[in-house]
Amino acid sequence: MGRFLFVSFGLLVVFLSLSGTAADCPSDWSSHEGHCYKFFQQKMNWADAERFCSEQAKGGHLVSFQSDGETDFVVNLVTEKIQSTDLYAWIGLRVQNKEKQCSSKWSDGSSVSYENVVGRTVKKCFALEKEQEFFVWINIYCGQQNPFVCKSPPP
């Protein structure tokens, strides 16, 4: 009996410690690798979406990607939530200089160390594209109204 209680208590401690990592995000946000993510269906231009993300959570920005795993997670989130008529979802990358080069930083200030860009053009903002199953980033007009994904550190 004592051994059973010890094992049960040990499992409870493990469960509570593991569930605590996901519980760090607000209940309507998703957790992945120490960050919180939320897809917002309302459509905004890039600048308004970035501002909105910063108002939703401390340290919040349009989503940045640091790995294939993070991209896969966000693509699944977008695919589950986006309306069938929407073609794009904003991400936190835009062209920031006169030479039409991508900024070396995401809107959250992190370095662009992982890239999945298709078709660089003179348009300045990037979005995930439905035609490519949201796996690639495409340059589109920043004033376009699109849904978006916010990313933040846990509160």
Curated annotation (Swiss-Prot):
UniProt cross-references to SUPFAM superfamilies, sorted A to Z: C-type lectin-like
Localization in the cell: Secreted
UniProt GO MF annotations: toxin activity
Protein name per its UniProtKB record: Snaclec bothrojaracin subunit alpha
Species of origin: Bothrops jararaca (Jararaca)
Keywords: Blood coagulation cascade inhibiting toxin, Disulfide bond, Hemostasis impairing toxin, Platelet aggregation inhibiting toxin, Secreted, Signal, Toxin
Gene3D superfamilies on file: Mannose-Binding Protein A, subunit A
PROSITE patterns documented for this protein: C_TYPE_LECTIN_1, C_TYPE_LECTIN_2
Intrachain S-S bonds: C25-C36, C53-C150, C125-C142
Distribution of this protein across tissues and organs: Expressed by the venom gland.
Annotated family: Belongs to the snaclec family.
Subunit record text: Heterodimer of subunits alpha and beta; disulfide-linked.
SMART domains assigned to the protein according to its UniProt record, in alphabetical order: CLECT (SM00034)
PANTHER family to which the protein is assigned, alphabetical: MANNOSE, PHOSPHOLIPASE, LECTIN RECEPTOR RELATED
